[in-house]
């Protein structure tokens, strides 16, 4: 009984603490328009590295959801979240077999960030050699908060949907 009461109190306090960190929710998708010439869109491969800078709008980065719609049956998509100084805050891996079995899937982060500070997430691939990426950020970033998008250190145009 006491243990149950303690758990309820902890859950309540955690809920109150998180409540202060939610700002206005926005939805932004970034990526490439796959209706244009294929040669103008970089294909995924072992050496592909995609980086997206962004500026946090509130105290919790609720979710970065990165998905690719077409994919191989082996390998993984790796995402690393770093601060402006290059310190790694979190790393996630999504095996391709999960993508194949469940359709386009993504990787999420729920992490505290400092409002207005610059962060970067980097996407790399291991064992994937096919289609094009569609990168999405759900309830966390607005157009003004997005920084440079690069593929293999080359700047890319961002498409906002």
Annotate each predicted stretch with a short phrase.
Residues 1-86, 97-118, 124-161:
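Beta-sheet-rich sandwich/jelly-roll-like modules and their strand-loop junctions
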């Amino acid at each position: 009984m006491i243990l149950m009461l303690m758990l309820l109190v902890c859950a309540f306090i955690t809920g109150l603490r998180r409540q202060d960190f939610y700002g206005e929710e926005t939805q932004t998708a970034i990526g490439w328009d796959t209706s244009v010439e294929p040669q103008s869109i970089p294909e995924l491969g072992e050496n592909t590295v995609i980086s997206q800078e962004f500026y946090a709008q509130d105290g919790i980065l609720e979710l970065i959801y990165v998905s690719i719609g077409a994919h191989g049956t082996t390998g993984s998509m790796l995402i690393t979240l770093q601060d402006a100084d290059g310190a790694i805050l979190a790393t996630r891996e999504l095996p391709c077999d999960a993508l194949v079995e469940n359709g386009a899937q993504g990787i999420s982060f729920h992490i505290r960030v400092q409002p207005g500070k610059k962060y970067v997430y980097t996407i790399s691939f291991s064992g994937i050699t096919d289609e094009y990426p569609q990168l999405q950020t759900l309830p966390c970033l607005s157009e003004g908060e997005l920084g440079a998008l690069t593929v293999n250190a080359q700047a890319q145009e961002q498409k906002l949907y």
